[in-house]
């Protein structure tokens, strides 16, 4: 029986860890084997994700763990390309790539920006490495030739910030919009291939370390709102959002290039 391959970036915590778990849990074919390739900065975090996956199903196997700083573009290109070269693609009938990694950036008014070197580093993490990893994957799939007919789904971890601007969130919003539009263009380049689909999945407001960072760094005007979300239990469990996304990926029944939001799907 052909296997599923799931590649996940930012897999050491938060939504990345959750999607690695849920893509295993949500497979409608419980007897199908699933191989996972996981990337993140923290190797310890990746090992924790690997251990959690192996307790979920004996059919799931983490075949590669890669500690990788996504702001180091030459290293991203070298390591990601090497990993792709070592995958036995002929074993898989379904390929899932969750391009999930990213940072919050600095929250603040544009007139107050000063650390432009760090902004450039965050841009490389959030956008340049996103382009590199996506491009290398589709290039590899093209190299496999017409005989390769697996179902492919590439998912961008998106946000409401990709389609709506918020004050003091200019850097994060613009990076999310960039990623969404990049994937929309990718979907058009492959529109004639109904087995190749691209999804911008808006995760919802998750109860993660990034949300803790938001509460610490947001403006005083916004702080009560974000603290209230936490105190009132309105933050979403990452695994709940990841299960919605996983079911979408397995169904393959969505319009390629679309932006779909957790809040519209969890009904």
From Swiss-Prot:
Binding positions for substrate per the UniProt entry: 159-160, 172, 204, 261
Any one Gene Ontology cellular component term annotated for this protein: cytoplasm
GO molecular function: sepiapterin reductase (NADP+) activity
Activity regulation behaviour: Inhibited by N-acetylserotonin and to a lesser extent by melatonin.
Keyword terms, alphabetized: Cytoplasm, NADP, Oxidoreductase
Temperature-related activity annotation: Optimum temperature is 30 degrees Celsius.
Designated name of the protein: Sepiapterin reductase
Organism: Dictyostelium discoideum (Social amoeba)
């Amino acid at each position: 029986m052909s296997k599923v391959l799931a590649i996940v970036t930012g897999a050491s915590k938060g939504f990345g860890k959750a999607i690695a778990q849920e893509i295993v849990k949500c497979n409608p074919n419980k007897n199908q084997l699933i191989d996972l390739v996981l990337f993140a900065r923290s190797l310890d975090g990746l090992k924790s994700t690997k251990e959690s996956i192996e307790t979920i199903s004996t059919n799931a196997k983490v075949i590669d763990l890669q500690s990788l700083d996504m702001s180091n573009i030459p290293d991203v290109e070298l390591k990601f390309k090497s990993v792709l070269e070592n995958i036995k693609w002929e074993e898989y009938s379904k390929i899932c790539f969750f391009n999930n990694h990213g940072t919050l950036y600095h929250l603040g008014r544009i007139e107050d920006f000063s650390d432009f070197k760090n902004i450039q580093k965050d841009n490389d993490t959030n956008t340049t490495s996103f382009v590199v990893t996506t491009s290398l994957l589709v290039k590899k799939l093209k190299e496999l030739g017409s005989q390769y007919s697996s179902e492919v789904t590439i998912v961008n971890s998106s946000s409401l910030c990709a389609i709506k601007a918020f004050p003091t969130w200019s850097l994060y919003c613009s990076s999310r919009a960039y990623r969404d539009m990049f994937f929309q263009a990718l979907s058009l380049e492959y529109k004639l291939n109904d087995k190749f689909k691209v999804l911008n999945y808006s995760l919802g407001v998750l109860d993660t370390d990034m949300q803790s960072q938001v509460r610490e760094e947001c403006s005083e005007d916004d702080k009560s709102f974000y603290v209230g979300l936490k105190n009132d239990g309105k933050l979403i469990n990452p695994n709940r959002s990841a299960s919605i996304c996983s079911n979408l990926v397995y169904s393959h029944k969505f319009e390629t290039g679309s932006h779909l939001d957790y809040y519209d799907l969890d009904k």
